[in-house]
């Protein structure tokens, strides 16, 4: 599953523009009430939210599978990394065969770099912004995770990813694109104190050559 376009809300576009341009060094374009960030294969778009809006999203960027230590050094020289309650700032998943780190953008969204070691995308050049390959995960909270996961799997033709259905946390999709489905109110990893919430989102995905769009709260697939 490929996430071609991801549209989110934010309260202040200017700090987001400066963050993605200066910290992650990604191409950005601010026009009117929208900010376009070119994140590799994905168009990441932030729309101006109404005054008083609150909310933090979780989304993730794939990086080349051999670049994790270099990506960590590159990013940690610019901004603090998020840590768990033991002080760890890198996280290995045996079941996913992946290594991750977490950080926040200017709006407080929980971002992630993940190196998926089963992917054949190694590079030999030093880590740079061009190795932010695509948005590969977006968190979508719901009140009933199992029902939501079953509905999405049926409509999109994807499967639960490397685990069984779980009523508090279920990922669906594949290594190129995952919907991360937590129960509403679950705290985003690692020890962020930020609860997953049902927030407005619009995401265009491609599954086996077929295009789908998920939008709104509650989310609808078209």
Question: What name fits each language-model region?
Answer:
Residues 49-53, 117-119, 184-189, 219:
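A short, sequence-level motif marking secondary-structure junctions
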Residues 87-131:
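Hydrophobic, well-structured mid-protein blocks that either form specific transmembrane helices
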Residues 13, 61-106, 140-222:
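Vicinal oxygen chelate
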Residues 1-51, 55, 62-64, 71:
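Basic, Lys/Arg-rich alpha-helical nucleic-acid-recognition elements, primarily the DNA-binding modules
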């Amino acid at each position: 599953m490929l996430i071609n376009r991801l549209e989110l809300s934010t309260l202040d576009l200017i700090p987001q523009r400066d963050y993605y341009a200066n910290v992650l060094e990604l191409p950005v374009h601010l026009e009117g009430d929208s900010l376009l960030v070119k994140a590799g294969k994905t168009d990441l778009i932030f729309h101006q939210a109404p005054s008083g809006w609150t909310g933090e999203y979780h989304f993730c960027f794939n990086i080349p599978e051999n670049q994790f230590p270099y990506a960590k050094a590159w990013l940690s020289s610019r901004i603090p990394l998020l840590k768990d309650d033991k002080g760890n700032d890198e996280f290995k998943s045996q079941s996913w065969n992946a290594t991750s780190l977490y950080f926040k953008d200017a709006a407080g969204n929980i971002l992630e770099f993940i190196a998926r070691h089963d992917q054949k995308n190694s590079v030999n050049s030093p880590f740079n912004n061009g190795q932010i390959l695509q948005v590969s995960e977006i968190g979508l909270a719901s009140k009933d995770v199992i029902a939501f996961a079953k509905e999405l799997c049926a409509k999109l033709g994807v499967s639960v990813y490397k685990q069984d259905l779980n009523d508090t946390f279920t990922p669906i999709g594949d290594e190129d694109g995952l919907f991360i489905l937590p129960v509403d109110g679950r705290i985003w990893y690692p020890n962020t104190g930020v609860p997953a919430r049902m927030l407005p989102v619009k995401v265009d995905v491609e599954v086996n050559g077929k295009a789908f769009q998920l939008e709104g709260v509650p989310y609808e697939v078209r």
